[in-house]
A protein has these predicted regions:
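Structural signature of beta-strand start/N-cap positions in the alpha/beta core
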Residues: 28, 52-54, 92-95, 116-119
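Conserved alpha/beta-hydrolase catalytic His-Asp/Glu region
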Residues: 131-138, 147-176
């Protein structure tokens, strides 16, 4: 009889310890959260997905319970740190799902380490038209302070911008 075990731990990377939640059994599913969130962003779907996969939800460095990186990080830096963590955890190949900036990181993983990804699922992946990108980036930058952190919002604004997930459907899981 299989007993499902949930594990919360951290794994060392050259840039600091990366926190993760491991849940379920089966083929590895690496879950990458949106900017400014953490593993809790997956809390509404991880129970369902972990019935079919070994889910690894990571707090990217500088988020949640992970260490802050010691220097400025860009997307390729996050990908290298994540790959390092995955190799230590013996996740040599798996499915990757990313939400928002997590989707950008997942695409970087696919580009930098294609041998490590079986399937790639992108949720709310930011895509910009080159003609409108400068204006959109400038407007978006107004939401962040000089340290690159989101500016405080009212509760109503935060609630309106909150992340919500659809209820996982069996056909989605079968398609993975």
């Amino acid at each position: 009889m299989f007993v499902q075990r949930n594990l919360t731990d951290s794994v060392p990377t050259p840039e600091g310890n990366m926190h993760y939640v491991k849940q379920g059994s089966g083929y590895p599913l690496v879950m990458l959260h949106p900017l400014g969130t953490s593993t809790w962003a997956w809390s509404s779907v991880i129970d369902s997905l972990s019935q079919h996969y070994t889910c690894y939800a990571f707090d990217m460095l500088g988020h949640g319970e992970s260490d802050d990186p010691s220097r400025h990080f860009n997307i390729p830096d996050y990908a290298n740190a994540l790959d390092h963590a995955c190799q230590i955890l013996n996740i040599h190949r798996g499915h990757y799902v990313g939400n928002s900036v997590g989707a950008v990181l997942a695409t970087e993983m696919a580009a930098s380490f294609p041998e490590r990804l079986d399937k790639l699922v992108l949720v709310g992946c930011p895509v910009m038209d080159y003609r409108t990108a400068p204006q959109r980036l400038q407007e978006g930058a107004a939401n962040y302070d000089e340290n690159g952190l989101p500016k405080p919002r009212t509760f109503e604004e935060a609630k309106a911008a909150g992340t919500s997930f659809a209820t996982p459907q069996p056909e989605w899981i079968e398609a993975m």
